[in-house]
Amino acid sequence: MSDESYESRIIDGKVLAQQVEEEVRSGVEDLESNRGIVPGLATILVGDDPASKMYVRLKHRACERVGIKAEDYLLPGDATQEELLTLIDSLNKNKDVHAILLQLPLPKHFSPQETQEAMEAISPTKDADGFHPYNMGKLMIGDEDLVPCTPHGVIRALEEYGVSVQGKNAVIVGHSNVVGKPMAAMLLNRNATVSVCHIFTDDLKKYTLGADIIVVATGVKHLIKADMVKEGTVIFDAGITKEEDGVYGDVDFENVIKKASLVTPVPGGVGPMTIAMLMKHVLLCAEKSL
């Protein structure tokens, strides 16, 4: 098969993101015309980490495209936990702010416990990222409301591409709270048989070879190789590794695409969908505030 023939196997996250953004734009216009409300997203950025600043810019551009009012709240790199919590409290009380996003990671002087405390301080009804334990708990019992954006984007892509999940073997590689755990829950909610693998899993290949659907998010360049997947597998690559010569995913895309029925590229796959689902969540937060 020629390289051109493989193009039909690529899940185009940019096209899907445009579809979601169009839906959000329509919803934003309806909310403004019928209720006089413009959805507002507050983004908290502590310090001046270049990668974090870049991600915030990407999110703001998406807000501009769909008509969401986005505002940055910047704290210096040496900000204290008390200062951060005070800011979050004020945003929780601000009726013009419908959704709050705390850009991670926080500077190194914030302990993991402090980061978690800050995430939990955000009102569950303004939790744009879907990370609050209340929203995670709802997800675990099958009540999907505000869920983490990357898994939400994967589910939307599965639906758009007509991939049946029920009864399928799904393997999640990586068990973070951001992708792995919520992804497993969302697939379980759709009656997939789910295995979650991680750094301590023996013989990862044994699991991936039996998978109909693979979602990988480890940050390990080309962890998933062609000999680790069976013909016809659907693969979502939510990992990213930046090197001097380019950006790479967790999947050896050039070789895996020859066996997969569908696969996301890096970049241009899961990333755009994640940001689009964030926009959808901001609109949802605004609608729930009525």
UniProtKB/Swiss-Prot annotation:
SUPFAM superfamilies: Aminoacid dehydrogenase-like, N-terminal domain, NAD(P)-binding Rossmann-fold domains. One of its GO terms (biological process) is L-histidine biosynthetic process. NADP(+) binds at residues 174-176, 199, 240. PANTHER family: C-1-TETRAHYDROFOLATE SYNTHASE, CYTOPLASMIC, C-1-TETRAHYDROFOLATE SYNTHASE, CYTOPLASMIC-RELATED. Keywords: Amino-acid biosynthesis, Histidine biosynthesis, Hydrolase, Methionine biosynthesis, Multifunctional enzyme, NADP, One-carbon metabolism, Oxidoreductase, Purine biosynthesis. This is Bifunctional protein FolD. Belongs to the tetrahydrofolate dehydrogenase/cyclohydrolase family. Pathway: One-carbon metabolism; tetrahydrofolate interconversion. Homodimer. One of its GO terms (molecular function) is methylenetetrahydrofolate dehydrogenase (NADP+) activity. Catalyzes the oxidation of 5,10-methylenetetrahydrofolate to 5,10-methenyltetrahydrofolate and then the hydrolysis of 5,10-methenyltetrahydrofolate to 10-formyltetrahydrofolate. It catalyses: (6R)-5,10-methylene-5,6,7,8-tetrahydrofolate + NADP(+) = (6R)-5,10-methenyltetrahydrofolate + NADPH; (6R)-5,10-methenyltetrahydrofolate + H2O = (6R)-10-formyltetrahydrofolate + H(+). Gene3D superfamilies: Leucine Dehydrogenase, chain A, domain 1, NAD(P)-binding Rossmann-like Domain. The keyword Amino-acid biosynthesis applies. Pfam families: THF_DHG_CYH (PF00763), THF_DHG_CYH_C (PF02882). It comes from the Archaea. Its EC number is 1.5.1.5, 3.5.4.9. One of its GO terms (cellular component) is cytosol.
